[in-house]
Amino acid sequence: MMRRLSVLMVMLVLGACSSMPHPAGKPLPSMTFSHLKALGLSVATKDISVQPTDNQARFSQNLDEMMEIYLTQKLNPRGEQGKVVAALDESSIVLVNENSPNAAADFFGLGGADIYKVMIKLRLEHYNDAGDLVYGTVVNAHREIKISEHASIAEREHTQFEGLEQLFLMLDQRVNKILLQDMKIGVGGVEVF
C-alpha cells in the first residue's frame, strides 16, 4: 500500500512540475511582421547585414533571425539608382535576476523576477550611385521584459514574445521616420504611423 501511495505521489508531483510548452497546447505565433507596412524605397538595391546577438540568455525567440526577417520585409527597393544599407551592428539579450521588494519574501528567496534587457543597434545608410554616403544614422532600441520567477514556461515565452513585439513596433516607427522624413527615399505615398 505504501509503495502505491509513493508512486501516486511521485506522479502527482511530476505532473504538476511539467508545464505545457505553449498556452493551451498551441504553439506561439511566428512573428511575421505582416502587420507592419513595407516601405517602397527610391533606391535600386538594399544591403542587409545582421551580426549575431550576444548572449541570448535563455530567450524563446532568436533576435537575429527576427531582425533579418523584419528588414527583408520592410525595405523594398523600387528605384533605379542608389542603395540603402540596414545593418544590425549590435544586439544583446541580458538576463538579470531581481530579488523581491518584500523583505520577508526575499528572506525565503521568493517573489523575485527575471528581467530580460533587450538592446538593438541598427545602422541605416543611404548611398548614391557613385557610392557616396548621402545620409546615415544609428537607431537604438531598448526594452526590459520583466517576468515573475514563478511564471510557467508557457507564460515566460508568451511574455517574451509580447515584449519583442512591442520592441519591434517602437523600432518600426523610428525606421519609418528616418527613411521617409530624414532620408526622403520613400515612394508610393506610405504614411508614417
Give the location of each predicted region:
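Sec-dependent signal peptide recognition
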Residues: 3-10
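C-terminal motif of bacterial Sec signal peptides marking the signal peptidase cleavage site
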Residues: 13-16
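Bacterial signal peptide processing site
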Residues: 18-21
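Short, low-complexity, disordered segments immediately C-terminal to signal peptides
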Residues: 23-30
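N-terminal segment of the mature soluble domain
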Residues: 35-97
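Short acidic, glycine/tyrosine-flanked loop/strand segments centered on an H-E-D-like triad
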Residues: 42-51, 129-156
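Surface-exposed short loop/turn segments
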Residues: 83-136
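C-terminal/domain-edge helix-coil "capping" segments
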Residues: 151-193
